[in-house]
Amino acid sequence: MDTDYESTYEDDSQVPNDDVVPYSDDETDDELDSPQTDEPEQNRRNVQAEQSREPVIKECTWQVKANDRNFYDQPEFKKKVFLCLKKSKYAGNAIKTYKYNPITFLPVNLYEQFKRAANAYFLVLLILQTIPQISTVTWSTTLIPLLLVLGITAIKDLVDDIARHKMDNEINNRPSEVITDGRFKKTKWKHIHVGDIIRINKNEFVPADVLLLSSSDPNSLCYVETAELDGETNLKFKMSLEITDKLLQKEEQLAGFDGLVECEEPNNRLDKFVGTLFWRGNSFGLDADKILLRGCTVRNTEYCHGLVLFAGADTKIMRNSGKTRLKRTKIDYLMNYMVYTIFVLLILAAAGLAIGQTFWEAKLGAANVSWYLYDGNNYSPSYRGFLAFWGYIIVLNTMVPISLYVSVEVIRLGQSYFINWDLQMYFSPKDTPAKARTTTLNEQLGQIQYIFSDKTGTLTQNIMTFKKCTINGTTYGDDDDELKSGQTKQVDFSWNPLADPSFTFHDNYLIEQIRAGKDKDVYEFFKLLALCHTVMAEKTDGELIYQAASPDEGALVTAARNFGFVFLSRTQSTITISELGQEKTYEVLAILDFNSDRKRMSIIVRQPDGRIRLYCKGADTVIYERLHPDNPIKDQTQKALDIFANASLRTLCLCYKDINKGDFENWSKKYKQASVATSNRDEALDRVYEAIETDLKLLGATAIEDKLQDDVSGTIFNLARADIKIWVLTGDKKETAENIGYSCKLLDDDTEILYGEDINVHLQTRMENQRNQMSGNQGAQSNQSGAFLPTDKKHALIITGSWLNEILLEKKKRKKKRLKLKFPRTKEEKEQQLHEKLKAYALKEQRQRSFVDLACECSAVICCRVTPKQKAMVVDLVKRYKKAVTLAIGDGANDVNMIKTAHIGVGISGQEGMQAVMSSDYSFAQFRYLQRLLLVHGRWSYIRMCKFLRYFFYKNFSFTLVHFWYSFFNGFSAQTVYEDWFITLYNVLYSSLPVLLVGLLDQDVSDKLSLAFPRLYVPGQKDLLFNYKKFFLSLFHGIVTSLIIFFIPYGAFLLTMGQDGEAPSDYQSFAVTTATALVITVNFQIGLDTSYWTFVNAFSIFGSIAIYFGIMFDLHSAGIHVLFPSMFIFTGAAPNALRQPYLWLTIILTVAFCLLPIVALRFLAKTIWPSESDKIQKKGKKFKAEVEQRAKPKPFARGVSTRRSAYAFSHQRGYADLISSGRSIRKKRASLDAVFDNYPAQITHFTPQT
């Protein structure tokens, strides 16, 4: 056993052995991508009873008692939450995405706000200002701005959380029917409990994970749509136990049901379930086929009844949703680091000035020369220096901008409203506007490097359309260009009373051929479509409704229906169709069902005239291998397939074969033997299928369009031009996902596609090179550090969920084997075990990093058959190893985890419910709006925020550092240059509005030019507009401005006389002069930084200056001094100073020296080193005329491809087994005795323990 333990890590470059190292309970099994066998119920029951009985009992620790809520109050069902407090381990059904409630809002919100370094700093500062020995300014200068910051942020957070409450209530208050007091009563979802019996009606969402007990279907079937879970819109069927379906139909029967279910604990495995139902002294095995998961929608079943097994947070979909993460932007983190940097600068400046105070006191202080400054305190010079340090911390505190965060929140709030109000992102057919569900991430939208997109409902409309076909070498169906130009008319199907009115086709020649009846192959072509399928038909209100295992198959049967070959009904052994009005019944001899390995399906029927014929449809790659050598239309069909593939249509080849009676009887014996094989049944059937599917005659091929949402290709094209890489993560089949990749222009024939096997080779080579390098092989160093792939060709990855398990998931040993491990006893054994663990972790991390490096070299990545957890892990890998900004977009509950994991989560509303929208940061109705969200709103938000921050730091440095220079002339006494009210109002009134408007309204180019030139988006991805370099440039700019603002007035005031013979060089006149020069300078500076001028911008700049003068004259008036003499001490300072022309000349000179060098530098930069934005601004009119031509993508041409995987089968396996078992056929309900007779190996005696 020790050998097994060590061998796990011997060769990590190889594919792990899943027999030894399976995935843990919380991980995805390898069976995810393997075909699922829909065997008849009885076959599975017998196998389970014989083989799985013992382990089921051991693993099932979750107990659910029907109709007995008191059962869950037992002590063994309680879990400790805190100290001695306990709560039930069974979760309620209410979901929660909000963060606060009325009790926790204030403490939690304040805690979150004070986690910001600046807020905590100002709280400490406020406390220091209450100490009179060190404070030279009043505490109100800090308290008022701090309360303003905390209050505005709290209101914004409250508004956001109220919106989350509303969304949660919308879900939690949905109605459901629950057995209460012996009868069904209307109950809200949030009041549903584990153990309740509920009724779910047609087209309703399943509110919890429930055990299907019975349904309106006579065969105990229930059809569900799982689009919210796995993104697939084709219907799946669930089957209840026949015993419960028979006995639990009526209300009183359900109310009396007292069964006990023992099953697995809540987990995130969507396709696995193990449990046992104990009822009436018998036990019945349960599997995933009997479970309805929350998020499914009941379709084509009038009603069904179920027992709630898991509720709320315990449901599988919620287990896949992940935790709500607090998201912050890169600029948030950068701002925090810059605030820390300012803290350091502040401490250094205060310490330096405190040292200066110490030396000044020792040489020139009151005890020596300046006796007139004696304050009565006999403090030593060092102690006075210590007090000065804290005094300067208070005086220079505005280096750390207290209003920074509240200003940022106001700007983000305004930008969010602009997104909400954007009519170009409004989807009128569903009355759905764009919605910014958070107000904290807008500028991050301008820095996206990777987009992770769901496929179903996000890129596609989930609509399959029969577009074209080729029959006997002739192609039917017109091109899109002809349709748009109006050259062809839509086919009129009014002659067919059974035609589907929603079906459209544009080629009247085909309908003429059918109705003429001259071409035998055309007749056989559509007869094949009507016969060779596993679709089930039912009539609802006199209307014929089809239920297909895949939307592709449904589209083909619907096409045959409209062309006059209508599938009407089927039984276990027959299928009835209408052939141009004549009803015919064919005997079904065998159905050779589709799976992902066969890539085809066949049906063998006995025709009314007694002949036996095999009809087959499948991918051209497998059909062509099985054709008879004498097939004259092979080349013509091949050319048509190339044309279809060039248009990204999903193709299927159709063929048939006549079988003589003797050959069929011999084959039938082998088929029956394989059907009842106890081991390797699927392999045996495949071999039998291969034997009969030979020497086929080709009829033609079909072409189905998987409709993309509007302008998906154009959106992806523009995003790619913006250097954004797009990864598609879907739960759908590989072939389907690959086809969509071609349709939306992620892939083309110039792209080399790498699959799992190819990637393994690359990764193994890289890891060998790394080992060689570690062992001293210098020759491998260049390979290890180089690129995986050549740069002269485009590459793409297409990988499956099962392959991803090798990269994403931590693998464990089986529990039964883990118990046999030898525990280390000696110190050496412990060190060896630790070394092995560290080695395994390092190798796993190395493999993950190599995979990410390889994937990021590709132009596109498509991950198919992935679970919600795997989607999130893929996103996390790129975040972790590339440090890139990521965006995830999806529309279903299966995308929630991915949406929460990415830096930005976008929900597509109106497709598959609201769960993705509820968990998203932004939502809208169509994928095409993503380009406007990023290239326009995201880019503008990033530019505005960067410009705002650069200017904000600049104006605060310019304001604060004047105190620093003044200290060298006031004995380092911590005296301020300005009056206290100017310090309080500078960031609130005098300089705040212009920069706020720039943060809200500024735009370097228009929205049309932003979309036409996506390369303008790149600076945000590279953090070019705000980084430490820009920060220190703002610091340097502020230092220079502060020097000019202090020393020019200082020099002008030195030894100067006024017109009245009095010296204007008093402290208050100097304070007024420097303050006036500062306000004018910083407001004109924001004017220089403004790219998009409006009346509001101009008014704010001149209005701020006017407000300054108005307030200053009021505060310096004698009247207010009389009312508050201690608060307003600058009486008459402004009127006396500003009536001197000499001081106005000083102010003008100071402003000119501050601004003229900036104007000159800006002019030189735009002339000599213009940016892309500068070039477009300069030639804006010319570029506007070229927008439409440059924005259009080139026509897509795949060229002739010899390889197509885009065949029209998107499902795992059809309904063949179900049809063969007869459970799909309408029949009378079986008697109770007959039901029990079907459970000979399943039912065992069981005595419930009380």
From Swiss-Prot:
Its EC number is 7.6.2.1. Residues 1-13, 24-40 have a biased composition (Acidic residues). Residues 155-338, 407-956, 1002-1034, 1091-1092, 1139-1140 are exoplasmic loop. Its cofactor is Mg(2+). It is found in: Cell membrane; Apical cell membrane; Cell projection, Stereocilium; Endoplasmic reticulum. Its main location: membrane. The active site is at 454 (4-aspartylphosphate intermediate). The chain crosses the membrane at residues 134-154, 339-359, 386-406, 957-977, 981-1001, 1035-1055, 1070-1090, 1093-1113, 1118-1138, 1141-1161. Keywords: ATP-binding, Cell membrane, Cell projection, Endoplasmic reticulum, Golgi apparatus, Lipid transport, Magnesium, Membrane, Metal-binding, Nucleotide-binding, Phosphoprotein, Translocase, Transmembrane, Transmembrane helix, Transport. It holds the Pfam family Cation_ATPase. It is a multi-pass membrane protein. Residues 1-133, 360-385, 978-980, 1056-1069, 1114-1117, 1162-1250 are cytoplasmic. InterPro entries: ATPase_P-typ_cyto_dom_N (IPR023299), ATPase_P-typ_P_site (IPR018303), ATPase_P-typ_TM_dom_sf (IPR023298), ATPase_P-typ_transduc_dom_A_sf (IPR008250), HAD-like_sf (IPR036412), HAD_sf (IPR023214), P-type_ATPase_IV (IPR006539), P-type_ATPase_N (IPR032631). Component of a P4-ATPase flippase complex which consists of a catalytic alpha subunit and an accessory beta subunit. The flippase ATP8B1:TMEM30A complex can form an intermediate phosphoenzyme in vitro. Also interacts with beta subunit TMEM30B. NCBIfam families: ATPase-Plipid (TIGR01652), ATPase_P-type (TIGR01494). Belongs to the cation transport ATPase (P-type) (TC 3.A.3) family. Type IV subfamily. Catalytic component of a P4-ATPase flippase complex which catalyzes the hydrolysis of ATP coupled to the transport of aminophospholipids from the outer to the inner leaflet of various membranes and ensures the maintenance of asymmetric distribution of phospholipids. Phospholipid translocation also seems to be implicated in vesicle formation and in uptake of lipid signaling molecules. May also participate in the establishment of the canalicular membrane integrity by ensuring asymmetric distribution of phospholipids in the canicular membrane. This is Phospholipid-transporting ATPase IC. The lineage of its organism: Eukaryota, Metazoa, Chordata, Craniata, Vertebrata.
